[in-house]
Amino acid sequence: MALDRGTLTRADLSEEVHREIGLSRADSAAVVEQVLEHMCLALARGENVKISGFGSFILREKGQRIGRNPKTGVEVPIAPRRVLTFRASQMLRDRIVSGN
């Protein structure tokens, strides 16, 4: 089970869909892959992804800034970039705190 490893994988999600909904293992894997693919495509297009009761994957633009090489102390420009952040919903945060 995923809790034994500490990491939930695609295979674990597919197996849960198979057990809970009763789809074949192949169909369950296809459903999981399609959901993840749609999420990835939306993010690649610059869209945020919000899953009610779970959380939001939010794209943010970071501007150029000056960083510093920790070994030499030399200032180095860091190019602007797009970063992905995740914000858990209040419902998910409450479930994590309560442990169920």
Curated annotation (Swiss-Prot):
InterPro entries: Hist_DNA-bd (IPR000119), Histone-like_DNA-bd_CS (IPR020816), IHF-like_DNA-bd_dom_sf (IPR010992), IHF_alpha (IPR005684). Keywords: DNA recombination, DNA-binding, Transcription, Transcription regulation, Translation regulation. SMART domains: BHL. GO terms for molecular function: DNA binding; structural constituent of chromatin. GO terms for biological process: DNA recombination; positive regulation of metabolic process; regulation of DNA-templated transcription; regulation of translation. NCBIfam families: himA (TIGR00987), PRK00285.1 (NF001401). Belongs to the bacterial histone-like protein family. This is Integration host factor subunit alpha. It comes from Rhizorhabdus wittichii (strain DSM 6014 / CCUG 31198 / JCM 15750 / NBRC 105917 / EY 4224 / RW1).
